[in-house]
Amino acid sequence: MFGRSRSWVGGGHGKTSRNIHSLDHLKYLYHVLTKNTTVTEQNRNLLVETIRSITEILIWGDQNDSSVFDFFLEKNMFVFFLNILRQKSGRYVCVQLLQTLNILFENISHETSLYYLLSNNYVNSIIVHKFDFSDEEIMAYYISFLKTLSLKLNNHTVHFFYNEHTNDFALYTEAIKFFNHPESMVRIAVRTITLNVYKVSLDNQAMLHYIRDKTAVPYFSNLVWFIGSHVIELDDCVQTDEEHRNRGKLSDLVAEHLDHLHYLNDILIINCEFLNDVLTDHLLNRLFLPLYVYSLENQDKGGERPKISLPVSLYLLSQVFLIIHHAPLVNSLAEVILNGDLSEMYAKTEQDIQRSSAKPSIRCFIKPTETLERSLEMNKHKGKRRVQKRPNYKNVGEEEDEEKGPTEDAQEDAEKAKGTEGGSKGIKTSGESEEIEMVIMERSKLSELAASTSVQEQNTTDEEKSAAATCSESTQWSRPFLDMVYHALDSPDDDYHALFVLCLLYAMSHNKGMDPEKLERIQLPVPNAAEKTTYNHPLAERLIRIMNNAAQPDGKIRLATLELSCLLLKQQVLMSAGCIMKDVHLACLEGAREESVHLVRHFYKGEDIFLDMFEDEYRSMTMKPMNVEYLMMDASILLPPTGTPLTGIDFVKRLPCGDVEKTRRAIRVFFMLRSLSLQLRGEPETQLPLTREEDLIKTDDVLDLNNSDLIACTVITKDGGMVQRFLAVDIYQMSLVEPDVSRLGWGVVKFAGLLQDMQVTGVEDDSRALNITIHKPASSPHSKPFPILQATFIFSDHIRCIIAKQRLAKGRIQARRMKMQRIAALLDLPIQPTTEVLGFGLGSSTSTQHLPFRFYDQGRRGSSDPTVQRSVFASVDKVPGFAVAQCINQHSSPSLSSQSPPSASGSPSGSGSTSHCDSGGTSSSSTPSTAQSPADAPMSPELPKPHLPDQLVIVNETEADSKPSKNVARSAAVETASLSPSLVPARQPTISLLCEDTADTLSVESLTLVPPVDPHSLRSLTGMPPLSTPAAACTEPVGEEAACAEPVGTAED
């Protein structure tokens, strides 16, 4: 519609020798216009092409030759444009002329050229010309023309549009007549035009007075009625769309309401004081209070007043507080919601409202007595009969205008007489003066009320505020709206109303224009507020109740509601000095967290992809925290909560469907409540995520590969590249390395990927090749994983290919298994030790030597340190988990050649009570008394004996001897000899466990490392000679490294 026509030519009309961009050609075109002053079917195409050519020459002259505009102005060529319009020449000519004028004004850059075009008032004559606006194309080009002109407004050009002598501003008044046009693009253009006009009016008092006195009240009253009509239509759509069939229409209505609010906020941001006063008064008393706020109460009470449903009212009020930050407006609105009383409103009869509806300060949602177009024409033609109406589309309620006829004319005459008698200075009518006075009076009343309220609140203590918030019914104020807010949070069936209430509380507390005292008066959460010692107990209890309901197996609480509850609770009780929550509430919260743990246990290993869901949900929760602004833009939450994904509603905004979604929901609830519990207790998160980036091998890391199991291969990437690499498999990762030229036996990592995200397939026609694909974890459960490696690996022979495939495939299984065991530790489930290390089975007699986890110190030293000997691939059975402390025999060498390094992909964290350790290279003994934990007292001998593996037999402590047992070392050597040389496991330490004598099995707590305890509680292996002293109970080193067992206590001191 807005594109240029194909027939745009610069036209010499057959005379190709003439330069089309020249003054001479403009003179020729002027001669053409003078010969064709009357539009006919024969010459209309010629006239259109001529006008286009003139426009092109004017744009060229603006940049290159000012004499073009001198000639244009001298010959008064704009008159020809206007005469062509006035001849009723038809749709084609009107469209082409409007299009041409729009292009002309868009491309003029010099103000002098613009002055030429705007002089003589011809542009205003085109603006007020009576086009046929029933034609969509004419309407589109006309409103685009007005928008282009409004963008040219400044302190100088505005005088060409606003005439102070005739008190007329055609650009503005003609534009606002389309404020309620059915086409959304037209309405958006009108908003842009009005905003441009308001910005310029700040520096032009005469124009500001005109806008204020002649247009503000009619425009804003009609605009408010238009917005309210959309709101009622939106509410009807929600009430009749229980089956989610009209979501498209509902989304459009919500988007329209958001556009209205942003437009109103843009007007308020301009900060034109009187315009803001009039607009605030109309919004409060004609829309927000009578339609939005009063709909919160007495939903079942009938009446003639328009009313919307409770969810829609809460939803729209949340949008108001999220978007509009004008302090007088939001504070007055919040005052009514938090402390308002309906007695004054309902004491008024319908007759009183109708009789005083012309006054802006009366709170009623009522249709304006006149349409905007009629009000503007009456203001323009005071003392004259009403002029003929301009052909236009139907305004809201215009069909009733013709029915009023003589009665309305009589009312107009009476109004004119009243204005003539009571008008001051001949500018303002008495009605307008009264409206202005009402606005000022209302503002003064609000300020006096706020002042008196603040005086009453000055000496109120925190305890009194808490009591007032807890027992609102005992106060002197009746707070029906606030009571309704709390009551909506109590619904045990679902969270349909609760979600909107939480959004409203969040929006009010985060509104920049909100007075904090209003929120603190009832102890609502205020971000960045001063330190306090009390909080809103009723609200906190309701939030905790929501969390407890969410942790139930059949809970109807959506994830969005739960996350918002956690957010508001933290905002209430978490201060910079710590948590101020009472113990009873904290205990209830811990109970909800325990319920969430039990809920996840029900789904543990219930799905094959539980691990993937667990990590995806944690990633989604941390990467995409809730944005309440975006949540309130979604129309789908207006409909009752549904449990089917067929509606297309986001998972966090609906109920789960099926076991997979129930598992996802249970995991997310567990994460939220765990995170909230840790933050309120001031404890750091040490066990999540399961994989931390800082603990993984990264590209360009330099690793010690001495005695590591490496397989040479050729990597052919998808784009055809071919490189020589060595394949190495770690606990969690596979890596491609190349030798480091600076140090022998060291390698530089060129690629590292997680084993759990890897797929390995053979190549049909080549037994030496494997296709390996590693995907990057998806940002959301619904997005497709992105492959970070997709290549073919070619090995030297099929044997190495089989070994690599087996190592990768079984390494992937083992990596996933270890993470599942870490999840079990998170859920306080008993851990069953794995019988495989990287997929290779071990004898049953040695299965307990390879405990499932080992938590290493997470400090990574730089590769430039020459003392670092990182052999991350040498011992494939060193896995992260519950630590087994290692020490050195006191008879061995006083120093070791190297430390036992932490796994490069070791556990990202240990439990809160776990002590991380590495083998001390210079320590020769461990004295129990120097590191004894006060919580580790010797266990009572009356406790039942535990059930231990065969090789861990309890003997009397006094029979221990300082000589090491060589039988144990010999047994370990025999067991490892059956493995491939590259898979020889590192020597495991002798295990000493502090346990209860009556325990039947090992518990998770018994495998958690704590400092040493009393020597009488140490247990040693069968067959070892008696030790002379408890401190000397160490085994003989089997290889270069030796390990000494530290006792293991419980995790819970």
Swiss-Prot record:
Biased composition (Basic residues): 381-392
Subcellular localization: Endosome membrane; Lysosome membrane
Transmembrane segments: none
GO biological process: cellular response to starvation; endosomal transport; mitophagy; negative regulation of autophagosome maturation; positive regulation of TORC1 signaling; regulation of autophagosome maturation; vacuolar transport
Residue numbers spanned by region Disordered: 375-434, 452-471, 892-983
Bias (Low complexity) ranges: 892-938
SS bond list: none
PANTHER family: PROTEIN CLEC16A
Subunit-level organization: Interacts with RNF41/NRDP1.
UniProt record similarity statement: Belongs to the CLEC16A/gop-1 family.
Protein name, as recorded: Protein CLEC16A
